[in-house]
Amino acid sequence: MIKKKNKKSYTSVYALGQYISMSTHKARRVIDQIRGRSYEEALMILELMPYRGCYPIFKLVYSAAANASHNKGFKETNLVISKAEVNQGNTVKKLKPRARGRSYPIKRSTCHITIVLEDISFYEQYKEYDEYFMYLKKPGSSNENKNLTCYDTYSSGGLWDKK
C-alpha cells in the first residue's frame, strides 16, 4: 500500500468523527449544504435545518473551531470550511426475533465525517501581491508542453567556420 505524504498546512485544522450512527447518504445531504461556507454561517445553517444528522455535524464543526482557536490561535471569524467529507463506516448487523421462530436482520450503518477548517486571514495579508504577480505572467501563456527543437550550433558550421 502506498501512502501519500501530506504537506503540513499551517492554515488548516480538522476534526474527525468516527462511527457516527447515521447513513452516509443522510449525512452527505447535510454536508453538501455547508461545504465552502464560513464557520458562523455554517453554524446558523446547521441550527435551522430540520434533519437529525445536523446535530453530530454541528458538534464536529464546533470542535474543529475549538481546535483552531486553542491549538493554533486562529480567530473563529476568519475560518472557512474548506473540506467536508463523509465516508462509510462499519455496518452493525443484528437479528430481531420474529414470530414462529424466525428472525429478521437489522443493519445499522455508521459513517466517518471529516471537517477541515482553513484560516483565510493568511490569504488576505498577501492579497496585494496578487496584482504584482499578475503582471509577471504573460497573457495567453499556458502550461501545456510545447514542441521545442534544439538546434546544434556546432555541427552547422555557421558559428565556428568564420575567422
Swiss-Prot record:
<dbReference type="InterPro" id="IPR005727">
    <property type="entry name" value="Ribosomal_uL22_bac/chlpt-type"/>
</dbReference>
<keyword id="KW-0934">Plastid</keyword>
<dbReference type="InterPro" id="IPR036394">
    <property type="entry name" value="Ribosomal_uL22_sf"/>
</dbReference>
<keyword id="KW-0687">Ribonucleoprotein</keyword>
<dbReference type="Pfam" id="PF00237">
    <property type="entry name" value="Ribosomal_L22"/>
</dbReference>
<comment type="similarity">
    <text>Belongs to the universal ribosomal protein uL22 family.</text>
</comment>
<dbReference type="GO" id="GO:0009507">
    <property type="term" value="C:chloroplast"/>
</dbReference>
<comment type="function">
    <text>The globular domain of the protein is located near the polypeptide exit tunnel on the outside of the subunit, while an extended beta-hairpin is found that lines the wall of the exit tunnel in the center of the 70S ribosome.</text>
</comment>
<protein>
    <recommendedName>
        <fullName>Large ribosomal subunit protein uL22c</fullName>
    </recommendedName>
</protein>
<keyword id="KW-0694">RNA-binding</keyword>
<dbReference type="GO" id="GO:0003735">
    <property type="term" value="F:structural constituent of ribosome"/>
</dbReference>
<comment type="subunit">
    <text>Part of the 50S ribosomal subunit.</text>
</comment>
<keyword id="KW-0150">Chloroplast</keyword>
<dbReference type="InterPro" id="IPR018260">
    <property type="entry name" value="Ribosomal_uL22_CS"/>
</dbReference>
<dbReference type="GO" id="GO:0006412">
    <property type="term" value="P:translation"/>
</dbReference>
<keyword id="KW-0699">rRNA-binding</keyword>
<dbReference type="GO" id="GO:0015934">
    <property type="term" value="C:large ribosomal subunit"/>
</dbReference>
<dbReference type="GO" id="GO:0019843">
    <property type="term" value="F:rRNA binding"/>
</dbReference>
<keyword id="KW-0689">Ribosomal protein</keyword>
<dbReference type="InterPro" id="IPR001063">
    <property type="entry name" value="Ribosomal_uL22"/>
</dbReference>
<comment type="function">
    <text>This protein binds specifically to 23S rRNA.</text>
</comment>
<dbReference type="InterPro" id="IPR047867">
    <property type="entry name" value="Ribosomal_uL22_bac/org-type"/>
</dbReference>
